[in-house]
Amino acid sequence: MAKQSMKAREVKRVKLANKFYTQRHELKNIISNMSISEEERWNAVLKLQSFPRDSSPSRQRNRCRQTGRPHAFLRKFGLSRIKVREAAMKGEIPGLKKASW
């Protein structure tokens, strides 16, 4: 189990990323637009750098919903491989069964 503080930190990052999404997107468009003057683009870079570090979506980490484990996360289920295996063995995931050949 991950510490509660790590789970809370991840929730905070998601909220910040959602809050600043449109502003970041607009500034990135300005930065990549070559028809805008160099000074305006540089000001956009400085403005983007002034945003909180955790507002960047690349700072987010997928975590298991049950345990908070950050590694071996399966997006399809929202769980780590360990919890997917446990749920599959109990028959809690419809249509999923252990492979045998």
From Swiss-Prot:
One GO location term (cellular component): cytoplasm
Keyword list, A-Z: Ribonucleoprotein, Ribosomal protein, RNA-binding, rRNA-binding
One record GO biological process: translation
Gene Ontology terms, MF aspect: rRNA binding; structural constituent of ribosome
PROSITE patterns: RIBOSOMAL_S14
Superkingdom of origin organism: Bacteria
InterPro entries linked to this entry: Ribosomal_uS14, Ribosomal_uS14_bac/plastid, Ribosomal_uS14_CS
Role this protein plays: Binds 16S rRNA, required for the assembly of 30S particles and may also be responsible for determining the conformation of the 16S rRNA at the A site.
PANTHER family recorded: 30S RIBOSOMAL PROTEIN S14, SMALL RIBOSOMAL SUBUNIT PROTEIN US14M
Protein family: Belongs to the universal ribosomal protein uS14 family.
Protein name, UniProt field: Small ribosomal subunit protein uS14
Species name: Buchnera aphidicola subsp. Acyrthosiphon pisum (strain APS) (Acyrthosiphon pisum symbiotic bacterium)
